[in-house]
């Protein structure tokens, strides 16, 4: 095999692994657009945009990855859906996960609403194999926000429900309004 063929085969192999590997994190300089996904390390869960049932609206959610029928376990913007496929998820300068419509990047549709001063490499969002979306400080590894503290309609192993007397946080499940409206 000559050098050119070896180079071509090696390049194709590298490209295959580069594009077939999924990412489970985003940082302050990255975005997730409608059509992009975060995939947990062991492929148990996916985070991305979806339209439930016959709805024309788009939601940011987490669902089981290894189940044939999409089974959503968490929804970020259930009260404020996005019209069309214009959703963008990012981390803002304050360390919040922020969901915008591409048509209006100034007004967030949904946010984690935490108050952490972020720097370029400080805050990371990661989708864990438990289905928990965690926002953490990359330096101290301390959790800033997690989806398990804000459940929607599904209880997953590791979640806690009820009142946390120390923090005052009350966690509870709320059913979907219909198959097309989470």
Model-inferred region functions:
Residues 2-182:
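Beta-rich ligand-binding surfaces for carbohydrates and other polyanions
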């Amino acid at each position: 095999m000559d050098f050119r063929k070896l180079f071509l085969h090696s390049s194709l192999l590298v490209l295959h692994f580069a594009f077939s590997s999924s990412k489970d994190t985003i940082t302050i300089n990255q975005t997730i657009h409608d059509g992009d996904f975060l995939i947990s390390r062991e492929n148990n869960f996916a985070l991305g945009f979806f339209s439930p049932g016959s709805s024309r609206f788009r939601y940011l959610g987490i669902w089981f990855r290894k189940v044939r029928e999409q089974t959503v376990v968490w929804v970020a913007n259930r009260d404020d859906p996005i019209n069309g496929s214009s959703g963008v998820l990012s981390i803002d300068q304050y360390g919040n996960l922020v969901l915008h419509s591409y048509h209006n990047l100034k007004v967030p549709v949904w946010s984690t609403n935490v108050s952490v001063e972020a720097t370029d490499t400080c805050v990371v969002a990661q989708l864990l194999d438990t289905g928990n979306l965690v926002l953490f400080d990359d330096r101290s590894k301390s959790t800033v926000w997690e989806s398990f503290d804000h459940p929607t309609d599904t209880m997953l192993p590791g979640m806690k429900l009820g009142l946390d007397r120390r923090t005052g946080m009350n966690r509870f499940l709320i059913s979907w309004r219909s198959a097309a409206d989470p």
